[in-house]
Amino acid sequence: NFCSIAFHQGRYITTRSKKSIMIEAEKLTHMPNFKGYIHDIGGPTANFRQPSCMLQEEHGLCKGKKCLAPKPCKNLVANHEEYLDILRSVRQLPGIKKVFIRSGIRYDYLLQDKDDSFFRELVKYHVSGQLKVAPEHCSAAVLDKMGKPHIEAYIEFSKRYFQYTGEIDKEQYLVPYLMSSHPGSTLNDAIDLALFLKKNHIRPEQVQDFYPTPGTISTTMFYTGLDPYTMEEVYSAKNPHDKALQRALLQYYNPKNFALVEEALKKIKRFDLIGTDPNCLVRPQTPNYQNRNNSGNSRNNKNNRNNKNSRGKQNFGGKKQNNYGRKKKNR
């Protein structure tokens, strides 16, 4: 609902022929600066190369319906045979060392293909260390407004991706695209996403804040405050500071965001997530924060009396959090 590619290029998928791709790939091998690496074969969504179903060719695209969200259509045909054939043929050309897929792929479409040949060869031959995918959020309510599949699809894809990666003894990761402040996303939803990222050891280096673009359903929600499909009211964070709070939660681990994260948690009274416990999102940023909030707790008062020597000092003890994934990269 938020992507404007369909307005730029149309909803109907058009593809180059295998012959055209092979001719261009062969030409590359004769260029003096070519090193043997083709960095991408695929469109905006690499694994879309055919009509969604037989009905689409006969009757055209469905109005007001989506092929994959909120659930895959029963008429959807998920097949990667042609795309896989092209990739295999290009790999076999003399002078070609590697063929990567750097365009994003629709993992929800990939999961609908009962033949796992493409999935396995994708992992084995076409990932240059990390693969881009776009779960965008974890909240079902927000994903429904986005027109994206629920997070269970991403979890299943991730599980199989790392399973296949382990079977070939490779070190490869996922780079998830994430979005803050999409219409329908509340501060509670942003906190749920932060907790999901923490639980799954995901530390995104870049996140996208929702920006309204002309013509999209999401922009309609943003400006009207209504879901055009249901006419129900939709909350949108529009104040720059409110948007900053949601964005900071997606990178809760970044020191420059600590103050914003603490403010967001206090705003909706999630004091349980402020502290030194491993399940917390941020350590207290306000001096004597814990003592002030726990002043009625007799056990804490006793501990304070027993720690006279440390009076005036904040105890931020605890295990250092691991930065999971390859250095300077994340999954």
Language-model regions, residue ranges each:
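Conserved, mostly hydrophobic/aromatic
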Residues: 21, 133, 207, 269
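Radical SAM enzyme [4Fe-4S]-AdoMet core and its adjacent flexible, acidic
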Residues: 52-55, 61-81, 144-146, 150-152, ...
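Canonical Radical SAM [4Fe-4S] cluster-binding loop centered on the CxxxCxxC motif
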Residues: 1-17
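Conserved SAM/AdoMet-binding glycine-rich loop
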Residues: 23-175, 179-183
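Radical SAM enzyme core and accessory elements
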Residues: 215-331
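Catalytic cores of alpha/beta
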Residues: 117-118, 182-199
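A generic structural motif
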Residues: 175, 204-212, 276-279
